[in-house]
Amino acid sequence: MICYFYISYNLEFLMLKNFQVSKYSLIQFIKINFFLIVPFILFGQNKLIVGIEKTDLYFPYIENKNIAVVSNHTSKFYINNKKIHLVDSLINQGYNIQKVFAPEHGFRGNSDAGEKIINSIDAKTGIPIISLYGSKKKPSNADLENIELMIFDIQDVGARFYTYLSTLHYVMESCAENNIDLIILDRPNPNGHYIDGPVMEKESMSFVGMHPVPVVYGMTIGEYALMINGENWLNNGQKCKLKVIELSNYDRMGKYILPEKPSPNLPNLKSINLYPSLCFFEQTPVSVGRGTLNQFQVIGKPNWNKSNYQFKPISMPGAKSPKFENQTCNGINLKNEKYLSELSLKWLIQGYKNEKNKEKFFKSGFHKLAGNKKLEKQIKNGLSEPEIKKSWVDDLNKFKKIREKYLIYN
């Protein structure tokens, strides 16, 4: 099993040389890293090679061209054991980077979920950074004037409501409209080992779900881009001229601990694994731990019955005004839950049962996360998790047949 390690809170990446690690280094690694050590022990024989590392495959395409890059803080790789950003690497190689487009959370990845991101100039390179989150979500024709090629490199987490997919859609659409080639540097999907959840219905589509796919779809972002093209999901059925720089030694059933947290409130493997099941709470009066160090690993609220676990959200980078700020929440700690290989509704169902004011539990935007208006009704009507999941089966089977056409990796 291949692993892509992330050590939280700015601890350095542990480099393995010929799979030999000193006893001291291993002890230090265990001491400083609170993630499960199992993925480390199961580190595979073949190193995962991500798209950004395969410079020999994409450098020839960008020679002597005006380039725009769609990236954020995750767009990094290692050269001589040093972490370097894609933009810095391309500039160092003398390539002509005209501008950078940034998704939700910004180019540096430190803005709150939903926070409006403004255009800026990168202090390090002087390159203009154009925000694709806020009032503007799609590159304009003026933005792309004189641009000959775009590169997309952002780490996704494999959940439909993670907005990097919608940014990908609009970037592809703009490239198609302006006859610009797009190169996607593929990355692993840390939730790529299963497919589950209700398939998005048209009436519930929004920026947190633009396509008829389940909550967890089991594809890399490169495979997903091929599906956007192949299923004619771009405006007027346009096609983007697309090239995917593929991964090597990728096992979609493997565990991937990412070298950078993909957004401020997904700090580790556990939070990423729980995210598809817990994100539904974002449209309820229940906290998922924003404003704590256990984001998407705990749930709770102040007026739940007193429990053995409590937490108090506070203002912090990435969660400037968290739900229930400075209030003690009674809740559940999910950090020791088993690694999920399916979407779990048990916490959402239990949360609704615990709610004293049930008519105010589901907010108006819940159906946009759920992908339909049925899930809310099913929970209100007391259906069990197996009964609800049974209603997804036909749509999931149809999606799996569509998905199969675009898979690059076994």
Locations of regions flagged by a protein language model:
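Bacterial Sec-dependent N-terminal signal peptides
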Residues: 1-47
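Short internal beta-strands
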Residues: 98-104
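Glycine-rich, charge-decorated loop segments at or immediately adjacent to ligand/cofactor-binding or catalytic sites
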Residues: 108-114, 183-204
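Glycine-rich oxoanion-binding loops at beta->alpha junctions
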Residues: 118-146, 159
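Glycine/threonine-rich flexible loop motifs
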Residues: 156-168
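Conserved anion/nucleotide-ligand pocket segment
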Residues: 205-275
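Glycine-rich, aromatic-lined ligand/substrate-binding cores of catalytic
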Residues: 248-324
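Conserved functional hotspot residues or short segments at active or partner-binding sites
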Residues: 295-393
